[in-house]
């Protein structure tokens, strides 16, 4: 999965999709580069305390995002969360859905343009805490009954991200 075809109002040719994805990748790289430059500048001026402040701000932002997403949630909160995340990842990520049940959704992400950009910038650490660490707080703030687990990330050099979202047992 990951093709733009599912979210476009009408089908486009493979060449058009590739051109669009190339532009998307360039924009992701530019955004990641600006973020890395800003964070490194804060680190140089304010040390680790400055970076920790930024890290906390991103964690809070992911939690707020989860709460906002929940406002538009359907009946099944787990399926609603995962459907929204899939829509968000279209184009910039490639994945296989390994499990699709009412209580558990499992994925194997094999491509992430964000991980590619942060790796190229030698800033996987920043990419990890800006993006990857937000996954769990986004899920739990969307609905406290939703859990999230992952043992691998493309951002940190693994061959995939193994995301699992599940309903916690009560």
Regions found by a protein language model. Give the residues of each.
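Ligand-binding pocket scaffold of soluble enzyme catalytic domains
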Residues: 136-137
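A contiguous catalytic/ligand-binding core that recognizes phosphate-bearing ligands
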Residues: 140
